[in-house]
Structure formats: structure tokens, C-alpha cells
């Protein structure tokens, strides 16, 4: 049925296609007003999308309460999958006081298992980056969920320290879903809001580390009420996260979509998307020095957070003589802060970019990461329970916001190797966690309190390299963009990832579109300077 459009129906950008603008919505938008005279045409290729999109068909509006396909559905499938994997990976942490008595674990055994739980994901996240670039985020997410589910079920059958460590190592592989989650949102949403979207997806997924601190003791208690002994109840409790992973894997395969225009394999067969070579994707990821700085930065933001998920419950339980339930609630509040802290970091990055460009994003990243690390030092030195809780909450907000701000920068490092760079950055988080747990929490050399303070000092020092991240087209914290007319263009930076032969085949066109949509990273002042001055100096009078 045809509809008559009028001015009162709303203009493009204020409503969905074919829907009036009268509905109340909750959204974050960067779309500029478009004159109402520009009517929607039936041959508009973007008309099939529920949200306004850019030239790459990436959404320019973020509506967290919507499940519209493909953009918002990919967002929700991505973060819930990651959330589920976080629950599984850290499900053992709040039950350690019971598990250690059942398996006769020493402090060293517990520390090594904590390292193992995050070490496996170093390799799986690297692999996931390549999988996303070559096969798409949908397959990567689903395979990670379903292939690691048997390991979660296996936790019910461990009999000694060795099997406990091995199973936690294998479960940790599922944390690779973080990479597919961030990749998925990066290809679905435009750069102007990518900090907020990635912050919400990553933060809400990380929240699983807090939820599991409440969920697993609760499930354990419920199973005990049925008549099971404590040493049996904790084993049955692991069936819950295992089942959740299988369910999410099926949902991702059946409901998900790789890219705004369809699944990657379908688009490659039709010739709409070129099939890339792994060697090329790998080379442009590892040779970019910015990748390795992000690797280190994430190692001491997300890495610190992963370490805290493994030690914080036991720290409050032992240091302040709390019950298992009370220690779990306090520990959960650390992870639950992700609900707003990480999105705040991403949003702050987006706002800084609108005002100051990429340089603003880098400053926000350094400030948040340094502040979070300082509060980590304070947490280790806190001598009373209220002060320790306050320090922990401030520390969690700073560190988690830094994670959000970092993934406001990461999508701009490379267009061709986006997945692999996301994988390397994510692997940095697990590497940093493994290092900090090995150095400070896996032996009797330091108390847990001393380990927390030393970890904070290390995080402060490792936040300094952000000053060396320089984009020729946008500059860095202290240096301006390149004065070279050619190098100062976004098209030159992203086009350099393609050979002349590849360009002649048109394989670089996606990167050029991305470059055009990334000009907002110049900042408001630079954008205004690029607007040509009208030939007539006086405005028309109306």
C-alpha cells in the first residue's frame, strides 16, 4: 500500500524508513538533519534497514532497546555471547573456598589455575581475529561457544589439581568471543559512535564476570538445599554455564548476520565482497606498531580486570573474614560496574573525538587508564572494609572505562586487518592478566594486598606508551597531523594497505569508503577549517 508523506511525518534521520517520528525511542545518534524536501525514494538501497546508515551501510544510530536486524540484533547476540563466556570462565572463582577443600588445592595451585583460565584465550583470540576477517563474526562466535561447552561440563568431573588446571585452561578459550563481539559491532556501526557501541558490547559482556560471582554461589546453595553435599553441589553447578553456551551458539547461527548486507560467504560468492588472503591480513596487522601499543595498553586495563575477577573474592574472604556469600556480593560489584563504566569510557572517547578528533580519544584513554591504576594501588593499601570497597569501585570504574576508550581507538588502526588487530589487542588483555597473576598472585612472595598495589604501579607505567600512537592524518597526544598534503589524507593511510594491482581490481573500495567515513576523526576545528568559504561574503536576507 502506498503512503502519502508530509512534513508532519518527520524527515529522514528523525524516523525509521516508512514509520512516523512520533514513537518514543531511546537512542544515541550522530546523524545530521536532512532537509525535508529530500524525500525517500523507493529505490533507496538503504531503505531495507531499520536504522539510518552511512555509505558502508553501517548504522549511524544506536538503539539499545531495539532488536532490529541486522545492526541491533548483531549487537545483542555479540554481547550476550561474550557475557555467557565470561560466566563460564570465572564460574570457579567464587567457589574456590569449596573447591580447594574438595581437591586439596594449595595457594600455588589456585594461582596457576587462575593464570591458566586466561592464558588459553591468548591463542584463541589471535585465531578468532583471523576467523572474523576470513569467515565472519557469526561462525567465529558460534564455534567458540559450542566447542568450549564440553570443557565447561568437564569441570564437574575433575579429581585433582592437574585436571582442575587443565579444564580451566580449556574453558578460557571461549573468551575469544570478545574479539568476534567487538569485530561484529565495528562492522555494523559507524565510526562516530563506535566508542559507545563497543563500550556497551564489551562492558555488558564483561559484566558476566560480576554476575558469575552471584550466580554460582546461588546455584551451589540451591543444589545443596536439594540434599546434595557441598562437594557434589559445586560440580552440578557447572552444568548451568555449559547449557547457556550451547543455547547461545544455536541462537547466533540461526539469528545472526555477518555484515549489514548479508553473510560474508554469500556476499563473497556474489562478488559484492572480495575474498582476502590470510597472509596479507596478518602482515598488515603485525607490522603496524600501533597494534603492539594497544596490545600492551589492553594488557594492563582488561588484563588487570581479568586478574581481579580471579582474586578479589578470595581477597575479601580472607583479609576481612567475610562469609563466602558476602565476599561474592562485593566481588560481583566490581564486574557489575561494567554495565555503565565501559560504555562511559567509549562515550567519552566519542565526545572527545567530536571536539578534538583522534587526539582527544588518545588523551581520554591515557587519563582513564592512569586514574584506574592509581586506585588499584589504593585498594592494595586499604586497611578497612569500607575503604577497600570504595577503592575497588573507583578502580573498577577507571579501568573498565579505559577498556571502553581503547576500543574507541582500535577500529581506526586498520581497515583491512580489523579482525586480527582486534584479536591481537584482545589477546593482550589475557597476556597481561597471565603476567600479573604469575608475578604477584601465584606464589607466597607477595600477599594479595601487596600484589594489588604492585600491579597498580605496573599499570601506571604501562599506560605511558599511548603518547607514541600517531596517525599521520590525525596526529597524536602531543604532535599535530602530518603537513604532507598526501599523507594527511585518510584515503592515503587506509589505501596503503593495498597494492597497485589490488587497487586496479577494485579490492580497496571498502577501505576508501571507510576512510571517507573516518574524516570526523579530524575533530570539529579541523572539519570547520576544511569547509570552503562562500564566494559572497554577506548572507542572503530573508
UniProtKB/Swiss-Prot annotation:
<keyword id="KW-0597">Phosphoprotein</keyword>
<feature type="transmembrane region" description="Helical">
    <location>
        <begin position="387"/>
        <end position="407"/>
    </location>
</feature>
<keyword id="KW-0472">Membrane</keyword>
<feature type="modified residue" description="Phosphoserine">
    <location>
        <position position="538"/>
    </location>
</feature>
<feature type="transmembrane region" description="Helical">
    <location>
        <begin position="421"/>
        <end position="441"/>
    </location>
</feature>
<dbReference type="GO" id="GO:0015112">
    <property type="term" value="F:nitrate transmembrane transporter activity"/>
</dbReference>
<keyword id="KW-0534">Nitrate assimilation</keyword>
<comment type="similarity">
    <text>Belongs to the major facilitator superfamily. Nitrate/nitrite porter (TC 2.A.1.8) family.</text>
</comment>
<dbReference type="InterPro" id="IPR036259">
    <property type="entry name" value="MFS_trans_sf"/>
</dbReference>
<feature type="region of interest" description="Disordered">
    <location>
        <begin position="516"/>
        <end position="542"/>
    </location>
</feature>
<feature type="transmembrane region" description="Helical">
    <location>
        <begin position="79"/>
        <end position="99"/>
    </location>
</feature>
<dbReference type="InterPro" id="IPR044772">
    <property type="entry name" value="NO3_transporter"/>
</dbReference>
<comment type="function">
    <text>Involved in high-affinity nitrate transport. Required for the nitrate uptake-independent plant growth promotion and lateral root response to the rhizospheric Phyllobacterium.</text>
</comment>
<dbReference type="InterPro" id="IPR011701">
    <property type="entry name" value="MFS"/>
</dbReference>
<dbReference type="Pfam" id="PF07690">
    <property type="entry name" value="MFS_1"/>
</dbReference>
<dbReference type="InterPro" id="IPR020846">
    <property type="entry name" value="MFS_dom"/>
</dbReference>
<feature type="transmembrane region" description="Helical">
    <location>
        <begin position="169"/>
        <end position="189"/>
    </location>
</feature>
<dbReference type="GO" id="GO:0016020">
    <property type="term" value="C:membrane"/>
</dbReference>
<feature type="transmembrane region" description="Helical">
    <location>
        <begin position="320"/>
        <end position="340"/>
    </location>
</feature>
<feature type="transmembrane region" description="Helical">
    <location>
        <begin position="139"/>
        <end position="159"/>
    </location>
</feature>
<keyword id="KW-1133">Transmembrane helix</keyword>
<feature type="transmembrane region" description="Helical">
    <location>
        <begin position="451"/>
        <end position="471"/>
    </location>
</feature>
<protein>
    <recommendedName>
        <fullName>High affinity nitrate transporter 2.6</fullName>
    </recommendedName>
</protein>
<feature type="transmembrane region" description="Helical">
    <location>
        <begin position="236"/>
        <end position="256"/>
    </location>
</feature>
<feature type="transmembrane region" description="Helical">
    <location>
        <begin position="193"/>
        <end position="213"/>
    </location>
</feature>
<feature type="transmembrane region" description="Helical">
    <location>
        <begin position="292"/>
        <end position="312"/>
    </location>
</feature>
<dbReference type="GO" id="GO:0042128">
    <property type="term" value="P:nitrate assimilation"/>
</dbReference>
<feature type="transmembrane region" description="Helical">
    <location>
        <begin position="362"/>
        <end position="382"/>
    </location>
</feature>
<feature type="transmembrane region" description="Helical">
    <location>
        <begin position="115"/>
        <end position="135"/>
    </location>
</feature>
<feature type="modified residue" description="Phosphothreonine">
    <location>
        <position position="533"/>
    </location>
</feature>
<keyword id="KW-0812">Transmembrane</keyword>
